From Swiss-Prot:
Description of how the protein assembles with itself and partners: Heterodimer.
Enzyme kind, highest EC tier: oxidoreductase
Domain of life: Eukaryota
Any one of the GO CC terms: extracellular region
Family under the similarity heading: Belongs to the tyrosinase family.
Record flagged with keyword Acetylation: no
Cofactor-binding details, from the entry: Binds 2 copper ions per subunit.
Designated name of the protein: Phenoloxidase subunit 1
Functional summary from the UniProt entry: This is a copper-containing oxidase that functions in the formation of pigments such as melanins and other polyphenolic compounds. Catalyzes the rate-limiting conversions of tyrosine to DOPA, DOPA to DOPA-quinone and possibly 5,6 dihydroxyindole to indole-5'6 quinone.
Organism name: Simulium damnosum
Classification lineage: Eukaryota, Metazoa, Ecdysozoa, Arthropoda, Hexapoda
Length: 195
């Protein structure tokens, strides 16, 4: 659990960064353009349900809190049940045209932002910008012509599965020399998949 001060400090640093960004010259079109590469379509397909629609639901989960708390007398595990938002896994399909005539490498970054404000009014991009959250970030190779990039939500580099969010550090520890050990030692940073 994070100290409440963390969030205040994080907000303060964000504000300083935004003040700095407002003093910079706007990016030029040349800086923002990727010559020869055009995104021609984007689609989000859930495992079930209509295309371009997130299927969300409430779910209850149990978590062991005893690793993050000190007790005067040993009491065993302390578990808590909490209700959280979850979603059906989905797949991004991005259609890209590479008219450069050569194979190109690119970085795909996917963000989620609100489309409308609390009154239902469509938001301007400059207002959405501060509310965006990165959903995924990955490198792709694009051959000349039309390309379809597919990526499952569970493959995201910025999210972690629920099991690694609240895992036990004592149980199932693999041998020191295996690839599984590197995976086990993963820092656990990232947004939970279920968010």
């Amino acid at each position: 659990m994070r100290d409440p001060f963390f969030y205040r400090w994080h907000s303060y640093i964000d504000d300083i960064f935004q003040e700095h960004k407002e003093r910079l010259r706007p990016y030029t079109e040349a800086q923002l353009n990727f010559n020869g590469i055009t995104v021609t379509g984007v689609q989000v397909a859930p495992e079930r349900g209509p295309t371009n629609t997130f299927q969300t639901s409430w779910q209850q989960s149990d978590v062991d809190l005893s690793r993050g708390m000190d007790f005067v007398a040993p009491r065993g595990n302390v578990t808590a049940r909490f209700t959280h938002l979850n979603h059906t896994p989905f797949t991004y399909s991005i259609q890209v045209n590479n008219s450069s005539g050569a194979q190109r490498m690119g970085m795909v970054r996917i963000f989620l932002a609100p489309k409308t404000d609390e009154r239902g009014n469509e938001m301007l991009f400059r207002d959405q910008r501060l509310m965006m959250i990165e959903m995924d970030k990955f490198v792709v190779s694009m051959r000349p012509g039309q390309n379809t990039i597919r990526r499952r939500s569970t493959e995201s580099t910025v999210t972690i599965p629920f099991e690694r969010t609240f895992r036990s550090l004592e149980e199932s520890r693999p041998d020191q020399t295996t690839d599984a050990q590197q995976q086990f030692n993963f820092c656990g940073c990232g947004w939970p998949h279920h968010m």
